[in-house]
Amino acid sequence: MPTINQLVRKGRLAIKAKSKVPALEACPQKRGVCTRVYTTTPKKPNSALRKVCKVRLTNGFEVISYIGGEGHNLQEHSVVLIRGGRVKDLPGVRYHTVRGSLDTAGVKDRKQSRSKYGAKRPK
């Protein structure tokens, strides 16, 4: 327990909140270039081939980003937009690619939740 005099001299240290998405640097999204597009398998109770890409961001960070939706057109050197949001069953994946923005096409034939997948309204 500090004395009053010690508190006057030093003060209490405020606890700093650690960011869950450090590569975004407090921005809502960041642009980057795909350096590798591949599939990976999820953690124990689940089984699938999840589509992910390694992205070199404009600020120099290299992150792994999840590609949501059925099918995608990404390949190496594609320019993508990254947002925060982890994938619980993929360790190390803390970002999502934004569908329907820059080089990422929206999901084809998507009828519901279209705004999340960059799909236009069907005629």
Swiss-Prot record:
User: What keywords sit in the KW lines?
Assistant: Methylation, Ribonucleoprotein, Ribosomal protein, RNA-binding, rRNA-binding, tRNA-binding
One of the record's GO molecular function terms: tRNA binding
One GO cellular component term noted in the UniProt record for this chain: small ribosomal subunit
Where is the segment annotated Disordered? 101-123
Q: What InterPro entries does the annotation carry? A: NA-bd_OB-fold, Ribosomal_uS12, Ribosomal_uS12_bac
Residue stretches of biased makeup (Basic residues): 113-123
Record-level GO BP terms = translation
Q: Which PROSITE patterns match?
A: RIBOSOMAL_S12 (PS00055)
Q: Which residues does this entry mark as bearing 3-methylthioaspartic acid?
A: D89
Gene3D superfamilies per UniProt: Nucleic acid-binding proteins
Q: Which HAMAP family match?
A: Ribosomal_uS12_B
Q: How does it assemble?
A: Part of the 30S ribosomal subunit. Contacts proteins S8 and S17. May interact with IF1 in the 30S initiation complex.
Question: Belongs to which family?
Answer: Belongs to the universal ribosomal protein uS12 family.
What task does this protein carry out? Answer: With S4 and S5 plays an important role in translational accuracy. Interacts with and stabilizes bases of the 16S rRNA that are involved in tRNA selection in the A site and with the mRNA backbone. Located at the interface of the 30S and 50S subunits, it traverses the body of the 30S subunit contacting proteins on the other side and probably holding the rRNA structure together. The combined cluster of proteins S8, S12 and S17 appears to hold together the shoulder and platform of the 30S subunit.
This protein is called Small ribosomal subunit protein uS12
From what organism does this protein derive?
A: Laribacter hongkongensis (strain HLHK9)
Give the gene symbol.
rpsL
